[in-house]
């Protein structure tokens, strides 16, 4: 199992950052290994992933939601890929009215070198959030 943890400070209020992370269908915009996400129900999602030259499909289960604080999820065992398991936790800490620390922890058996990619995922998420924020001259 490959495991990694990383943190980043985002210039946005915790409520906005948390809400954006809940937009599961947008994960491919910042987690480059995820190619497509489809919501199945309130707590389950189908995901298509690609890394190491291979395509993978997984069903993700949201296990924990603490509004504006924490989310946790895992992949469910599947007959197509019984040995491919992953889990993640993302925590949100308000540093000020306009600043949030995001900490992401990922564990994966997919062999995608999560430890090398976690920083990129967080940087991509930060860019997504901060690029969407209204600029002062737009207010």
Predicted segments with their positions:
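Generic structural detector for well-ordered beta-strands
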Residues: 7-11, 38, 48-50, 61-63, ...
